[in-house]
Regions:
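Non-catalytic accessory regions flanking glycosidase/transglycosidase catalytic cores in CAZymes
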Residues: 1-180
Length: 180
């Protein structure tokens, strides 16, 4: 990661890149994108908790574009970036399947529940008070105040019964729970 970063953020992006993004005058920023959320296989589908904490401890994996991600720009850095340049974050979550436009793999209920909980944990990390588990992790990572996270994208261009079942489970999750 660069040393000379925008707002001197630890693990932040280069100033010139952030200035270009800022000058676009966008209103929101989608992260981590689409296909990266789904992964090539269920093992490479993105998990929120693999994108926070010390960069050298974050697992890397192959992407469908034939290179590896370091997860160097993780969820926390993304939320800070949005805060720094006044963008509304739109977090993309896995909806219980790999890419439907390649060889789709629909997760069984137990694994789908793990990804549902992962999404709930990410939302808690971003928005909950510090006396919750994930709010406390955010505080330990240097940001005691909740981030402004209003938008969640469920899946990436997904469709069908499996998608609708996950969407229904996600939208009916009224209570954010703190399971790691």
């Amino acid at each position: 990661m660069p040393v000379d970063t925008y707002n001197r953020r630890v693990n932040g992006l280069r100033k010139d890149i952030v200035e270009l993004l800022k000058n676009m005058n966008a209103s929101f920023f989608r992260f981590p994108g689409g296909c990266i959320v789904e992964g090539i296989t269920r093992e490479t589908a993105l998990r929120f908790k693999n994108t926070i904490g010390p960069i050298w401890e974050r697992p890397s994996h192959w992407l469908m574009w034939f290179y590896r991600t370091s997860n160097g720009l993780g969820f926390h850095e993304y939320l800070q970036l949005c805060e720094d340049i006044n963008l509304s974050p739109m977090y993309v979550i896995n909806c219980g399947m790999t890419c439907q436009h390649r060889k789709p793999d629909y997760f069984e209920e137990q694994l789908t529940d793990i990804y549902l909980q992962d999404a709930i944990n990410a939302i808690e990390y971003a928005t909950a008070p510090v006396d919750t588990y994930w709010g406390g992790v955010r505080d330990a990572n240097g940001h005691p105040e909740p981030f402004s996270l209003k938008y969640i994208e469920i899946g990436n261009e997904n469709y069908g019964d499996e998608y609708l079942a996950f969407r229904s489970a996600m939208t009916s999750s009224r209570k954010v729970s703190s399971r790691a």
